[in-house]
Structure formats: structure tokens, C-alpha cells
Amino acid sequence: MKTIAVNSFKGGTAKTSTTLHLGAALAQYHKARVLLIDFDAQANLTAGLGLDPDCYDSLAVVLQGEKQISEVIRSIDSSGLDLIPADTWLERVEVSGSLAADRYSHERLKTILSTIEHQYDYVIIDTPPSLCWLTESALIAAQHALICATPEFYSVKGLERLATFIQGISSRHPLNILGVTLSFWNYRGKNNAAFTELIQKTFPGKLLNTRIRRDITISEAAIHGKPVFSTAPSARASEDYLKLTEELLFLLRDI
């Protein structure tokens, strides 16, 4: 089982959309068994797959020892895509209940996921766009980190802080930076070279070749609670996310 934490330091980087479509592509087109984990209290991944966050338990109850992980997994479709939804309790889970007194609470998610390692080919975790307990727990539980950015000043500058955060974790836990993916890409953007140069400086050799172009069909798919592969299979967003999935599979082949 390969576990990937999808990260950003700023909202609006298509982090959740990337998580959703990577998982959907692996399940639908590569016949993989995929578990998506919405680990962001905003619950956009949950809503984007057509579930109401107010109606389901999140990993919070599992982290607190109140339920088993099998009790919070929801089947999304017959392709092999499952989801653990998010809820607002995630936002404060580390300061309540049994986690509050556990000095090793960051390790708990890793332990929980080890109990299902034979059930899935991939676990993909959508983390909050901040350097918090949830993000640290996800990175400790993961073998790989996928970083999302946009060709904007604040997004790219935030990568420097994220790089320092990840470096601190990888010094204590094995963690591979799978790559940096750029979304909302305009091939005619006048500052493209400057942005890509800064990313290469922050994460040398990690900028992925695939660019996710801006496409309204992604937002339209979210309204229907489905991946864009289902609502607009011929859209450029579908093409881009399939290419991204292929590129990541190539990078993962020997790891």
C-alpha cells in the first residue's frame, strides 16, 4: 500500500481537486483499490464526492479510539474508490479526548492505517492548507508527499515554509517528495519562467512536467459530486489529470 499526502501551504491551489482526480483516475482507469482520506475540516473533498459532511463520521472518532477505521470508510462507486469523510471535529481533535494527553499523538494515524495496508493499493490524504497537527500526522503516516502550487506569488513563496516543515519531518520519518504539481496553468503566462525557477530552487528536480490548466468543468463536476471524468470526460481537465496520474505512476513504479 502506497500512502500519499497531498499538501499546500495556501488555499486555492487545487489541492483537493488534485486529490480527488488522482484517486478517481487510479480507481477508474488503472483498476486500483483506492482510499481517499479527507483530513481537512473544510470537508471540500467530501462534498466534492457528493457526501454531506454533517451526516458522516470522520477519522476523528478513530483517532480518539471510539470507532474502528472500517466503520468510517464509505464506498463512492463500484470502481474501487472509497472515502473517509471529514467533519468539523477534525479541527480540534488533537486537543480533546485521549489525544490531548498523548505526546506521540502524531503517530496515531500511521498506526491506524497499518491495519488496512492489505485492503488498498493507494491511500491518498487531503491535508489542510496549513502547517498544523493534521498535516504533520498525515506526512508521518505517508511514504510520499505531493505538493500543490499555482503560478502566483503567495503560492510559490509559501512553498519555502512548506519545504522547511517537510524537511523537519523527513529527518525523523522516511518521506519522499513525489513532486510539485502546478494548477490553474496558462501556457502564455508572462511570469511562468520566474515561478518555475523559484519552485526548482525550493524543490530541486521535483517540478512535475504535467500542468493542470484552468477549466470550468472542474467546478461543474464538483457541483454534481463527481469527478470530471464522469461529467466531462473529453474536457482538458480530464486530459490533464490523466496525464498527471500517468506521470506519478511512472515515478512510483520502483518505490
Swiss-Prot record:
Source taxon at top rank: Bacteria
Organism per entry: Chlamydia muridarum (strain MoPn / Nigg)
Name the UniProt record assigns to this protein: ParA family protein TC_0871
Q: Which InterPro entries match?
A: AAA_dom, DNA_Partitioning_ATPase, P-loop_NTPase
UniProt xrefs under Pfam families = AAA_31
**Classification via SUPFAM superfamilies:** P-loop containing nucleoside triphosphate hydrolases
> Can you tell me which family this protein belongs to?
Belongs to the ParA family.
